[in-house]
């Protein structure tokens, strides 16, 4: 019963997080955090009840579904230590430290804090022309100061606190998926969850194309300034980042269904005559998602899509028959390109050749962000403080606010420093290597291999896209990223249900 409740909440979050404007508003990501918290609490209750039940028995028979067993989990690996160290680093940014310690660990932080306390002139290197030297103009507030003689490593502790709870929740969600015992048959439950992700991706694609081609240009009740396809994500680039994970995962799911039918029918003629309509619908849905990503006109999104389709075709080539490439991903991509060409790709193509100004603006943001990293090299300016601290370093004039550095890795480095980004990179490499080893441990022709390869290719595509966009900063994309990564790590533990 509890497992089914957890499953219901998880499915609800997989649907809610992208549709609620990518969960970027405070109310949306707060509901996401509450949903994750409820799942963890329910799992803890279930774990406790099973433990009490087993203790009450005079003899301790083995539990058939092994509810007390911790699966092949990262809880027994160095990954947990690295995750804990990263969270401790963020907590370290939020606790008051002696000013002398801050002066050693972050000299520029000490200089700014000293300016707030003493009222001395602001460092001239941080003032852009026309700016004020008041604390509020720098994105800082003297109310964030702790008691006399102590400073925070984070320039804006409240912003760091908000972002810390986001990361804590998502890390908790990732670890929860490592230990949760799927209800009923694990393979069937996993297929159901992947199908939900696929359907949400198709809905976002169809809705986005309807709004774009009809001329409404809306995301639910919000009017969009851009005519590109964006679904309910507001930004085409965030929308592209989401689909970059969904499309390879869906291709892997499609091929896993195909493999099931091959294993069952033993022969391509028998399989072809018995091809299930659902497989054709899944293939059509993938074509629709690729089509919508093309019409999003996200340049790096399209480049990452082409890369991911090529990569998944190469990785699947050796699974059967020794082919040089897997034909199905190539066929799906070609069909989507032909359909897009029939509709008209003039606007998309022209955008690729008018990118100089856009790249120039990104380059300016990157250069100024590097200046931030140089001033806060070890521990950063504080997780979640980029929007407030960047105006001190901005060397160009814009209307509005720069919310992201247009590069996840660079922004995280400015927020958590070289120490924090180093921990995250080591953690990512360790988990990615473990996921690859898990997939390689599966037997040839195991349908789970297709799902695993599709999930990993989606993760790689998102990382490539993150070189010029913000993806980890978007709650819906971060939630799906954590889900796919956790599921791929769990695949060797999942008992697959043959169709």
Enumerate the language-model features and the residues they cover.
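Canonical alpha-helical transmembrane segments
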Residues: 41-56
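Aromatic-rich transmembrane-lumenal/periplasmic boundary elements in polytopic membrane proteins
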Residues: 89, 94-121, 159, 210-218, ...
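Extracytosolic (periplasmic/ER-lumenal) interhelical loops and adjacent juxtamembrane/interface segments
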Residues: 102-153, 372, 384-392
